[in-house]
Regions:
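N-terminal beta1-alpha1-beta2 module of alpha/beta enzyme domains
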Residues: 1-73, 179
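Active-site beta-loop-alpha junctions enriched in small/polar residues
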Residues: 8-10, 44-46, 76-78, 106-108, ...
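Short coil/turn segments at secondary-structure junctions
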Residues: 11-15, 77, 118, 122
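Alpha-helix N-cap and loop-to-helix initiation/capping positions
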Residues: 16-23, 50-54, 81, 85, ...
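Conserved N-terminal glycine/acidic-rich loop preference
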Residues: 27-29, 39-41, 80-85, 99, ...
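Residue-level signal for well-ordered alpha-helical scaffold segments within enzymatic catalytic domains
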Residues: 30-33, 61-64, 82, 95, ...
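Low-complexity, flexible helical/coil segments
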Residues: 36-43, 72-80, 106-113, 137-143
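Internal, glycine-rich beta/alpha segment that forms the wall or movable "lid"
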Residues: 85-195
Length: 195
């Protein structure tokens, strides 16, 4: 039997953040020693009980206190990030993890705070279409070949090499073709169809 963890994480809002991260890292170390096979770390920007705005940073640190456990980003809210940034960060993290990484995506919960702080309406009806477009663009970046994508939400891509060896797109994942992708969903309409 395999055991895993899902860390929101939950901490009292009046807790000192540095201490809560140390507690969570200690939990990762103990779980790894006990044989837990994976841990998923949530992404939460505006929830005082769940102080984890960058699960990638936490996972990068947790990799140093574990040796076997795999980590999942649970989940990256793609509508809150540009797909090029996500592709680069997750590919780099996959190298740091040497393949001990899962990439989770989801729409999250729409809060007024996210809308007011980031200017992103997470309750819009086309949020799932944006997620589908974003994951497609991320996978194109991970392929590492020149492409241009002009879609409903994004106009981006990898340009053709210009003969300059100083600048070029180079960050493809450690795992081939990319880290396993998990899609979160709490209802039939909250996930996205992916293959």
């Amino acid at each position: 039997m395999e055991l895993g963890l899902f860390l929101m994480p939950l901490h009292r809002p009046d807790s000192f953040h540095a201490d809560t991260y140390d507690q969570d890292l200690n939990l990762m170390e103990v779980a790894d020693d006990l044989g837990y096979t994976e841990s998923w770390i949530g992404e939460h920007f505006t929830m005082p009980w769940e102080n984890m705005p960058s699960p990638e940073l936490f996972v990068a640190r947790a990799l140093g206190v574990t040796s076997r456990m795999k980590f999942g980003i649970g989940v990256s809210l793609l509508h809150m990030h540009h797909p090029a940034h996500v592709a680069l960060r997750i590919a780099q993290l996959d190298h740091l993890a040497r393949g001990r990484l899962y990439f989770g995506i989801g729409s999250g919960s729409g809060t007024e705070w996210n809308k007011e702080i980031f200017g992103v309406d997470t309750a819009r009806e086309d949020i799932h279409s944006q997620m589908m477009e974003a994951v497609s663009v991320i996978q194109q970046f991970w392929a590492g070949k020149p492409f241009h994508h002009k879609g409903t939400f994004y106009d981006t891509g990898i340009p053709e090499p210009k003969g300059d060896t100083l600048f070029d797109y180079h960050m493809i994942p450690f795992q081939k073709p990319h880290p396993p992708i998990a899609v979160a969903g709490s209802s039939p309409s909250s996930g996205i169809p992916v293959s």
